[in-house]
C-alpha cells in the first residue's frame, strides 16, 4: 500500500498524461497501467475553459487521484502561483512541485524548489517535490514536511534509466516519507530496478507515451513495478565472488 498524506493507493505506478498520440490511446494506456495517480501540467490544461478539450473529459475521474504539476515554473513564485491555480480549480489538493533550473537538462533548481515547497506546505497543500538525486536536498525537503520526495533517475524524457543507483539508495535509506523515482525511466527494466532498490513508487510518462505501442508499454510498466516491489520485499541473494552449487555434493548417492 502506497500512502501519501491521508491517501492510500494500491498501485505504486504514477503515470503522466502528456504527449500521447491521441486521447483514446491515452485513455487505454491509463486503464491498463493500473495507475491510480495521474499527473499533468497545469499550464497545458484548460481547467477554467470548459469549451476547450482536455484529457479529463476522457476519463472516469472517480477512479483516479489527480496530481497537477508546476512544469514550466522557473522560480518559487511561479510554482506557487501555478499550484494555487490548480487548487482553485477544485480538482485536487496534491501538487507536484517542479521548478526547472536548466533548460537544457531540465534539472530542478534546488533553492527555488525548497522555497516553493515551504510556502505550499504552509498553505496546506500535500506536496511532492521533484528533485535531483542529491541526498542532502532530499533530506531537507523531508525535514520541511513534504509528503513524498521524487528524485529523478536521470534527466526528464532522456530514457537513460537510473544513472546513480547509489544516491537513490541513500535517499531511500534515510527516508521517512515515500520515495517516488521520477524522470528518466525508459524501460520496464528501469522501473523494476527502481523498485528493487526500495523505492515506494515510480512516476513516468515518456517511456509509455513515446513507446511504439503505448498501451502495451503501460501494461509492461505495471508488471515491472509489481515485480520490482515483490523482489525487494522478498530480498535478493547476496552477490559473491565465487560459485555456490544449488545442488551440494553432500548427501548425494554414489552412482
UniProtKB/Swiss-Prot annotation:
Broad EC category: transferase
Domain of life the protein comes from: Bacteria
An individual GO BP term: thiamine diphosphate biosynthetic process
Keywords: Cytoplasm, Schiff base, Thiamine biosynthesis, Transferase
Enzyme Commission number(s) of this protein: 2.8.1.10
Residues binding 1-deoxy-D-xylulose 5-phosphate: 157, 183-184, 205-206
Molecular functions per Gene Ontology: thiazole synthase activity
Pathway: Cofactor biosynthesis; thiamine diphosphate biosynthesis
SUPFAM superfamilies in the cross-refs: ThiG-like (SSF110399)
Family from the record: Belongs to the ThiG family.
PANTHER family per UniProt: THIAZOLE SYNTHASE
Function of the molecule: Catalyzes the rearrangement of 1-deoxy-D-xylulose 5-phosphate (DXP) to produce the thiazole phosphate moiety of thiamine. Sulfur is provided by the thiocarboxylate moiety of the carrier protein ThiS. In vitro, sulfur can be provided by H(2)S.
Protein name (database record): Thiazole synthase
Name of the gene this protein is made from: thiG
Amino acid at each position: 500500500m502506497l500512502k501519501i498524506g491521508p491517501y492510500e493507493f494500491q498501485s505504486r505506478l504514477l503515470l503522466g498524461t502528456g504527449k500521447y498520440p491521441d486521447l483514446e490511446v491515452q485513455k487505454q494506456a491509463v486503464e491498463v497501467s493500473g495507475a491510480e495517480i495521474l499527473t499533468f501540467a497545469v499550464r497545458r490544461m484548460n481547467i477554467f475553459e470548459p469549451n476547450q478539450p482536455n484529457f479529463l473529459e476522457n476519463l472516469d475521474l472517480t477512479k483516479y487521484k489527480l496530481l497537477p504539476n508546476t512544469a514550466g515554473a522557473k522560480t518559487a513564485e511561479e510554482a506557487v502561483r501555478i499550484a494555487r491555480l490548480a487548487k482553485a480549480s477544485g480538482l485536487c489538493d496534491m501538487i507536484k512541485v517542479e521548478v526547472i533550473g536548466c533548460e537544457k537538462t531540465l534539472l530542478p533548481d534546488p533553492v527555488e524548489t525548497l522555497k516553493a515547497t515551504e510556502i505550499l506546505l504552509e498553505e496546506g497543500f500535500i506536496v511532492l517535490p521533484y528533485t535531483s538525486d542529491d541526498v542532502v536536498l532530499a533530506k531537507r525537503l523531508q525535514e520541511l514536511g513534504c509528503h513524498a520526495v521524487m528524485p529523478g533517475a536521470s534527466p526528464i524524457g532522456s530514457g537513460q534509466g537510473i544513472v546513480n543507483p547509489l544516491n537513490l539508495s541513500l535517499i531511500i535509506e534515510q527516508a521517512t516519507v515515500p520515495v517516488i523515482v521520477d524522470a528518466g525511466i525508459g524501460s520496464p527494466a528501469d522501473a523494476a530496478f527502481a523498485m528493487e532498490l526500495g523505492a515506494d513508487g515510480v512516476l513516468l510518462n515518456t517511456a509509455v507515451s513515446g513507446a511504439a505501442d503505448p498501451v502495451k508499454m503501460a501494461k509492461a510498466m505495471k508488471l515491472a513495478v509489481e515485480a520490482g516491489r515483490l523482489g525487494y520485499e522478498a530480498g535478493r541473494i547476496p552477490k559473491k565472488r565465487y560459485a555456490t552449487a544449488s545442488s551440494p555434493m553432500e548427501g548425494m548417492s554414489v552412482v
